[in-house]
Amino acid sequence: SLLEFGKMILEETGKLAIPSYSSYGCYCGWGGKGTPKDATDRCCFVHDCCYGNLPDCNNKSKRYRYKKVNGAIVCEKGTSCENRICECDKAAAICFRQNLNTYSKKYMLYPDFLCKGELVC
């Protein structure tokens, strides 16, 4: 769920999901269109695509469990949906951490109308 995802983001990046990633660029937050603005925004695009591959799962509200083992996120065994959602969120949180050096405050609260075009997963 968004609760676990937010916790993962904080643990991996030291940033609060809201406001840091809730409306960043063209893809972080609800929906998305256009060309990702930077590597962090591309993390969100890939995360959206990952969720898009789980049409039968309630991605944003489905709770799951994970733990940290030697600093690494490990998704705990749950239902198929829980496991797959956790893996999508884990990949995004790690992607955010790997791209912290290019995170730019200018893309926070980025206006949707500046996001043009369509990308296909």
UniProtKB/Swiss-Prot annotation:
Annotated active site: H47, D89
GO CC field: extracellular region
Family membership: Belongs to the phospholipase A2 family. Group II subfamily. D49 sub-subfamily.
Lineage: Eukaryota, Metazoa, Chordata, Craniata, Vertebrata
UniProt KW keywords: Blood coagulation cascade inhibiting toxin, Calcium, Disulfide bond, Hemostasis impairing toxin, Hydrolase, Lipid degradation, Lipid metabolism, Metal-binding, Secreted, Toxin
Keyword Protease carried by entry: no
Reaction equations catalysed: a 1,2-diacyl-sn-glycero-3-phosphocholine + H2O = a 1-acyl-sn-glycero-3-phosphocholine + a fatty acid + H(+)
Disulphide-bonded residues: C26-C115, C28-C44, C43-C95, C49-C121, C50-C88, C57-C81, C75-C86
Tree of life domain: Eukaryota
Function: Snake venom phospholipase A2 (PLA2) that exhibits anticoagulant activity, probably by binding to factor X and its activated form factor Xa (F10). Shows no cytotoxicity. PLA2 catalyzes the calcium-dependent hydrolysis of the 2-acyl groups in 3-sn-phosphoglycerides.
PROSITE patterns according to UniProt: PA2_ASP (PS00119), PA2_HIS (PS00118)
Name the UniProt record assigns to this protein: Basic phospholipase A2 daboxin P
Predominant location: secreted
